[in-house]
Amino acid sequence: MKIFYDNEVDALYLGLGEETPEGVSEISSGINLDITSDGKLVGIEILDASRKIDIQTILSYNLVLNQKMLAM
């Protein structure tokens, strides 16, 4: 999983795969799922992210995961 945060537009993206999404499904206001043509979930986009979740907590998880992977 790859985590991207754009603080200029306050958007968080969780990349769940390398496949190119073919469509988007809005599941709630400002929360979108990127899906392939066969329905596989490949990404989650959260707009106005800092109002919906603790961004620093999410970004720190990414750092911890990367450090554990480097230790292997």
Which sequence ranges carry the predicted segments?
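C-terminal structural segments of small proteins and small subunits
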Residues: 44-72
